[in-house]
């Protein structure tokens, strides 16, 4: 797991590293076409980009694409399907996923039944500090971000911030946010009976019909 939010601890430092070495980041630039040479071993000769100022063509010494499954499928030239490795990419199917965040007024994963006072003491974090897995809920993995990544997710006066990943997400994509939150909250309380009396203070749901996985 990252120490905190991806922008602060992953993409941000990568961007800083590139900028410090003279690189530039161009947002709102979309690859419309990959230009390449013909022959048995074609090479990329340039990229046709759509930009806010109009279409442009760029050439480079090297080309690197970091895409999700739908993105790389759109990017690859159709003619490259004659190569098995590129044709195989079109066989991939992205898995739907729903990510649910639930904030409580105490510490959910404190397991001691006799530790009610400790569970309610939001000034003193307690519980399971790790990425967790369960076979007894519809979320395959979860973590208390307030414990595992307090730099970005701990909030004064609040307790646990559970992030739960619902997979497979197919049944959840058409559901309303309220339904998903209620269902996930109920399963959290079933997994941790000692936390049943905690109050859910905030929630958020992100649904991806085509995830990165």
Task: Specify the residue positions occupied by each region the protein language model found.
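C-terminal segments that line or cap access tunnels to active or ligand-binding sites in enzymes
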Residues: 48, 53, 60-62, 67-213
């Amino acid at each position: 797991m990252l120490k905190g939010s991806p922008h602060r601890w992953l993409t941000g430092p990568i961007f800083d590293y590139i900028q410090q070495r003279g690189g530039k980041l161009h947002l709102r630039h979309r690859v419309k076409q990959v230009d390449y040479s013909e022959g048995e071993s074609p090479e990329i000769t340039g990229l046709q980009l759509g930009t806010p100022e109009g279409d442009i063509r760029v050439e480079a010494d090297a080309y690197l694409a970091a895409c999700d499954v739908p993105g790389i499928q759109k990017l690859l030239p159709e003619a490259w399907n004659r190569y098995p490795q590129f044709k195989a990419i079109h066989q991939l199917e992205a898995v739907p996923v729903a990510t649910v965040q639930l904030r409580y007024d105490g510490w959910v994963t404190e397991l001691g039944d006799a530790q009610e006072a400790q569970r309610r003491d939001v000034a003193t974090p307690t519980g399971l500090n790790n990425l967790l897995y369960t076979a007894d809920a519809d979320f395959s993995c979860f973590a208390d971000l307030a414990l595992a990544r307090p730099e970005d997710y701990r909030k004064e006066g609040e307790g646990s911030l559970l992030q739960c990943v619902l997979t497979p997400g197919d049944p959840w994509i058409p559901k309303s946010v309220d339904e998903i939150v209620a269902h996930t909250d109920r399963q959290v309380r079933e997994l941790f009976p000692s936390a049943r009396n905690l109050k859910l203070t905030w929630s958020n749901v992100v649904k991806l019909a085509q995830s990165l996985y």
